[in-house]
Regions:
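Non-catalytic substrate-recognition/targeting regions of SAM-dependent transferases
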Residues: 105-118, 134-209
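S-adenosyl-L-methionine
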Residues: 258-301
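C-terminal catalytic and target-recognition region of SAM-dependent MTase-like enzymes
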Residues: 296, 337-399
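Mobile active-site "lid"/loop adjacent to the S-adenosyl-L-methionine
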Residues: 298-327
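Conserved class I S-adenosyl-L-methionine
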Residues: 225-234
Length: 399
């Protein structure tokens, strides 16, 4: 097997079980020229075995699969998937009567860097974020079938937009197990008893933003009798929770017509009336907020897409978060509540909080932090990989 030899002193992060080997840590490669996605072994400059993982050209040269000396075979994949499954059993998600959508594998958080698997009812949706995981998808599918048995009827690969295209992989989304009878239409799932249509074929990510489940439940608690504005609403997750929590009215805003069509279907699916309980606005969320009447909304949800996907975009992202949150804090009704989020991994909790602080100071209003929010337990953070805590949120009480 090909060996990756590290520069002197660069083994320390691996000895602390961090799962990434950066290109700058590599001294030389022995035993041949690895192809992208190959399993390679990693050694210290002194010859000490450190782990094995998937090789890839780029800033992260190796993503560690195991710190033990073992073969990455069908049994390895079964153990890995079964470990993730058992963790979701512990969380009460597997077999739940009121929640049928959850994350089964969360990359580094489940010790499988580069792999995401979400469960929607009887379908698993797989996303590979590395060449190695993409090339391992058939073995992963077999492991999923072994773990779930007859409860799993289909596996959909949605790696076309996430796997590294420069690796020359044959990327094409599609079913790798089960019939394509579902086509491109949406399938209904439950989340805390709320019904949602999920389209994993055409939707963003794997079809739904599962990482906001706990935060949506908190919105429900604050919504009774309130006029609610949900910005960047996608398919209306927060909107449905607000309605089910007894909101007087909910307005949802997103620039995607497809997303707004799905919002309206979800509203009807849950027994509410479009135009009565809920109103959809297909337009730019920031422009909508700029022109909306101040004091109209008791509760606002501000959940934009990632403003920064690499460190070079950090400063611009922080300015954008400040502008956006200043608008929300300025416009919300006195005594109102703002739920605000960032899903940008490169924007840490401190930077996000500083951007929101600057926004509040700009408005001159009195603002208190009621909650600090993060991702749910089925999006776990590997304690040795703190970068995995990407979702951060604040709940603000604005006087």
């Amino acid at each position: 097997m090909v060996r990756i030899i590290l520069n002197k002193g660069k083994e320390q992060s691996l000895k602390r079980f961090h799962p990434w080997v950066f290109s700058g840590a590599v001294k030389r490669i022995e035993g041949g020229d690895p192809a992208e996605g190959d399993v390679v072994e990693v050694y210290s400059s002194g010859g000490e075995y450190l782990g094995c993982g998937h090789y890839q050209i780029g800033s992260i040269t190796v993503r560690i699969l195991s710190f033990n000396k073992e073969t990455i075979d069908s049994d390895f994949w079964y153990r890995a998937i079964k470990g993730a499954y058992d963790a979701r059993c512990t969380l009460g998600l597997v077999g739940s009567d009121n929640t049928t959508a959850y994350r089964l594998v969360h990359g580094e958080g489940d010790f499988l860097p580069g792999l995401i698997i979400d469960i929607y009812g009887n379908t698993a949706v797989l996303q590979a974020h590395s060449a190695g995981m993409f090339l391992s998808k058939d073995a992963i599918a077999e492991a999923l079938k072994r773990v779930y048995g007859s409860a799993l009827e289909a596996i959909y690969d949605k790696s076309e937009g996430t796997a590294p295209f420069k690796a020359g992989l044959p990327l094409k989304d599609g079913y790798i197990y089960g019939k394509e009878g579902a086509g491109t239409d949406a399938q209904a799932v439950l989340e805390n008893g709320n019904k949602f249509l999920v389209n994993w074929v055409e939707g963003q990510k794997t079809g739904f933003f599962l990482d906001q489940r706990d935060n949506r439940a908190l919105v429900k608690k604050y919504s009774v009798g309130k006029n609610v504005l949900n910005l960047f609403c996608y398919t209306g997750g927060f909107s449905i929770y607000a309605l089910s929590g007894g909101a007087a009215h909910v307005d949802s805003v997103d620039s995607s017509r497809k997303a707004m069509d799905m919002v309206e279907r979800n509203v009807e699916l849950n027994g509410f009336k479009e135009g009565v309980d809920h109103t959809s606005y297909c337009e730019d969320a920031i422009e909508f907020m700029r022109k909306c009447e101040g004091g109209k909304y008791d509760l606002m949800i501000v959940d934009p897409p990632a403003f920064a996907k690499h460190r070079g975009a950090l400063d611009n992202a922080l300015r954008a978060y400040k502008r956006l949150n200043a608008l929300a804090i300025e416009k919300v009704k006195p005594g109102g509540v703002v739920f605000t989020y960032s899903c940008s991994q490169v924007v840490d909790k401190q930077n996000f909080a500083l951007a929101v602080f600057s926004a509040a100071a700009q408005t001159g209003r009195r603002v208190r932090i009621l909650h600090r929010l993060t991702q749910p337990a089925d999006h776990p953070v590997n304690i040795y990989h703190p970068e995995g805590e990407y979702l951060k949120g604040l709940v603000l009480l604005v006087e």
